Amino acid sequence: NPNHTITVPGNAGQVISTGGYNVANGGLYLDSGRGFTLSGEVKPDFCAPAVNVYGPGLRNRFVTMTGTSAAAAITAGACAQIMEWGLVKRNQIFMSSADIKNMLIRGADRADDRSYPNPSWGYGTLDVAFEDLRR
């Protein structure tokens, strides 16, 4: 079924699952996993940049990468920023992984022409510069 392509471990309940999109044209990355899960849970949770993502490569070079692995790396970086805000800067010292997931979902940018959550975009696109983290 082309609308249920997220598999283990991405379809597990407590994990953060990210789809991918093309920042240049705003479109969904063709090979991005789609949900919802067969049990009805929203997956992906949101989408992150996945096409022509510029980042570190081998031998001290920078390269462009395409794929949801790039989107997952960006999402991991966002999680690290939230953990720093919560734990290191002591804004939320009892932060859990569920708290991080909820912050990412709550902060996701939602396009006006889509309904959310949906099986392609989840709750929107990754955006960690949202108001709750600035307090």
Predicted regions and their residues:
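Extracellular S/T/G-rich loop segment that most often corresponds to the catalytic His/Ser-adjacent loop
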Residues: 2-80, 130
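Glycine-centered flexibility motif
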Residues: 35, 90-91, 122-124
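Hydrolase catalytic cores
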Residues: 51-116
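Caspase-like cysteine protease fold
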Residues: 114-135
